[in-house]
Every structure is written in C-alpha cells, then in structure tokens.
C-alpha cells in the first residue's frame, strides 16, 4: 500500500502544473537557443503564461509568425495534435552588436576606426540595431553619432555608387548577346539598388547598379 501511495505521489509531482511549466520552459529555452544561434550564445527564457494555459502534451510543437522578433516579450504558439495554445514568453538574449567607437558626423563613412563590436543584452537594444558588422560596409551616417551609441539601420545608408547626373555605362544582357551604351544617371543609387538612366537617344531605362558602377539590364 505504501508503494502504491508513493507511486501516486510521484505521478502527482511529475504532472503538477509547476513541473509541467518548468519542462515547457526548458523546451522553449532550447527552441529559442537554436533559432538565435549565430546571434546570441546566452539565452534565458521565462514563461509568463499561467499553468492552466499550458499545452497538455509533453512535447508541443512551437512556432511564431515569420515577422515576429526573437527576443523581449513575445508570443509563441504551442501545438499538441488539435490543441493550440498561445504562450507569453520573455526572452533575454546576450550577444554582439555594432556600436559607435568614435564620433561620426552626418554624412561620414562608417569604418573600422569609428565603429566596434560590443557585447550586451540584445533584447534591450533599440529596434533594428546592427548585429553583423558586415552590414555597415561602405555605409554612410544619416545623422551625427556619438561614441557608445548602438548603430541602427535607420541611422545609415549605403554609399552612393552612382550619383544623379553622372555618366554611366549601361550593359544590357540577353541570351547570347551583350550590348553596352552610355547614358546619364537620373538618381542616386548604391550597389544592388535600382537606377534610372537617360540614354543619348532620350529613352529612359532602368537597371541594377553593380560594384563597378555599371547599370545592368537583363533582357
């Protein structure tokens, strides 16, 4: 009889709301750690939903909307067969981000001399903070930036490879042929952006700027 009672006690403990919440929290930590690999090497997940809102199965399938952020206060869908629960979760993520190392004036270029990688809580940074230093290659500041300030994508733009009024080469490629002609750029554009060109004939064409400043058109 004592053995039976102990069995019931163990079962009650295993399936208690607290134990289930801890297990779901551990699964969520693993799930977010996998998705944040390459950005964060230290992830702390806190389940905020009450125990009565947890999924009933032991290993639910987690998902989020494609545009959802991966840290801070987020909502996660937990599915068990036909059951679907929405869980409120707080995710703390620590990793590297790009910060200003020396003052940068508006219009100034971002270089290894004036930016650096810093380590900190990604979930506490401003929106669209740059995490990959390669994203600022050939970038120009849109405002004055102070040392220590996280670099956000809204603060920078790519340097113009082509400027309005500049003479450019237009290269039209088709199946088995390539045609070159000269024209005048009608707008500023960075590499991989679209530029409109007025040809000597007066015709206006549009193409993609390459790294050499040529305008490429695929026919």
From Swiss-Prot:
Keyword NADP: no
Disulfide bond entries: none
InterPro entries found in the cross-reference section: Flag_basal_body_FlgA_C, Flagellar_FlgA, SAF
Subcellular location(s) per record: Periplasm
Keywords: Bacterial flagellum biogenesis, Periplasm, Signal
GO biological process: bacterial-type flagellum assembly; bacterial-type flagellum-dependent cell motility
Coiled-coil zones: none
Family matches, as PANTHER family: FLAGELLA BASAL BODY P-RING FORMATION PROTEIN FLGA
Role of this protein: Involved in the assembly process of the P-ring formation. It may associate with FlgF on the rod constituting a structure essential for the P-ring assembly or may act as a modulator protein for the P-ring assembly.
Annotated family: Belongs to the FlgA family.
Name under which the protein is recorded: Flagella basal body P-ring formation protein FlgA
